[in-house]
Regions:
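SAM-dependent transferase fold signal centered on methyltransferase-like domains
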Residues: 1-396
Length: 396
């Protein structure tokens, strides 16, 4: 049973921004403080300040040990998931720290949190009332065992553990625990809607092959870093499955980039390739690159693709709402030594990206005598006619 004394609680408040490693070395200075608990809570608060900002000022919230917190969702992705399903009843079969459950539960009249680790259940049972989530029932059980006997609900959520027995990260559905492919029929006998959070490294084709009742796919990125692959199962699967490519933004005025396509649309879409560059260069966000929506981008926006294997686009006029990074082209040159010297000799620092080019970023940076960073962006790529180009840009 977790208990935190008033002295330890005060210590946590007073040292909430301290370096936890330094504090651990000073444990003998504070004999009346439960230092392991204090360290866990202080570290948790510091991570939560970034991952779960709305909990930042809630001093009563308890946090788990680092591994569980490392694996949990961020608030921004949990809020997105909450938009995808509402109803009367929800069951989260892999409760964990409870972030996903706490945000998903706001759209349901009742919810059940299932977790086999007793300590995480204690933490969840303590935290949910503080978050005004008194309608969540906490069950300290194995999720698969609970699934066998549970009453039907509107929605089931699972976040299978993506670590193998040696502690390494895994990406195949069959290597996750529980194996949702084996449980698909049972899950859909208990709920009309099943939401599964998987590794963004999972191959989409493999996921669609293994999960026969997929209705939607959502690929979530945060600030252009791919974070989650969400698969929504239902009683029937449409002929063409919608793939939502979402980039959630915490900086700037734009909050979200969102493009929806199907694999069949991708095959049907027309794409214009180019031998020359316009005034602007576009790099699709991480979700679009993961999904392989290369033709669909060209169909949705008035852009030209540099080459079938160069996943960069160009246009003469500025396209403000393009779902990715936008750059103004300053100049371009071939990989010829003379041209490189004429166009790039003044550069000491630049952000270098390689797309469909015969050298690596490290090799190119070394050849150009550049350090990483600054306001200049260099894209080394290939045009449709096979010409190798280095494109010098500024971010819009």
């Amino acid at each position: 049973m977790i208990q935190i004394s008033s002295e330890t609680q005060l210590f946590i408040r007073e040292h909430s921004s301290d370096n936890v490693r330094a504090l651990a070395l000073q444990a003998k200075k504070y004999p009346d403080i439960d230092m392991p608990t204090a360290i866990t809570q202080i570290a948790g608060r510091q991570v939560a300040a970034e991952k779960i900002p709305s909990w930042r000022e809630m001093e009563e919230i308890w946090y788990p040990k680092h591994l569980s917190l490392e694996q949990c969702s961020s608030e921004i992705t949990a809020r997105y998931k909450a938009r995808l399903s509402q109803g009367d009843s929800l069951t989260d079969l892999t409760g964990g720290f409870g972030i996903d459950c706490s945000f998903l539960a706001t759209g349901f009249k009742s919810a059940t949190y299932v977790e086999r680790q007793e300590e995480l259940c204690e933490i969840a049972a303590h935290n949910f009332p503080i978050l005004h989530l008194n309608h969540i029932n906490v069950r300290n059980e194995d999720g698969v065992a609970y699934l066998q006997t549970m009453s039907p609900v509107d929605c089931i959520f699972l976040d299978p553990a993506r670590r193998n027995e040696h502690g390494g990260k895994t990406v195949a559905i069959s290597d996750c625990e529980p194996n949702v492919a084996e449980l698909e029929a049972l899950l859909l006998s208990k709920a009309n809607r099943v939401m599964i959070k998987l590794s963004p490294m999972l191959d989409l084709s493999l996921a669609l092959k293994e999960l026969k009742h997929t209705q939607e796919i959502h690929i979530l990125s945060v600030n252009n870093e791919c974070k989650e692959l969400l698969i929504l199962l239902g009683q029937t699967s449409p002929a063409e499955i919608a793939i939502h490519c979402v980039n959630l933004l915490t900086k700037g005025t734009q909050e979200e980039q969102h493009l929806v396509f199907t694999r069949e649309q991708e095959q049907r879409s027309q794409c214009t390739y180019t031998d020359s560059l316009g005034n602007y260069l576009y790099e699709p966000n991480a979700s679009l690159l993961k999904a392989g929506a290369f033709r669909s981008i060209a169909a949705a926006y008035p852009v030209r693709k540099l080459h079938p294997n160069s996943h960069l686009y160009t246009s003469d006029s500025f396209i403000e709402n393009f779902p990715g990074r936008i750059f103004r082209i300053v100049n371009q040159c071939s990989f010829n030594k003379k041209e490189v010297k004429e166009n790039l000799a003044d550069l000491k620092k630049a952000n270098v990206t390689v797309r469909n080019f015969p050298t690596t970023v490290a090799e190119l940076r070394k050849r150009l005598h550049l350090t990483e960073g600054g306001d200049t962006y260099l894209f080394a790529s290939t045009l449709n006619n096979g010409q190798k180009v280095i494109i010098r840009c500024e971010k819009v």
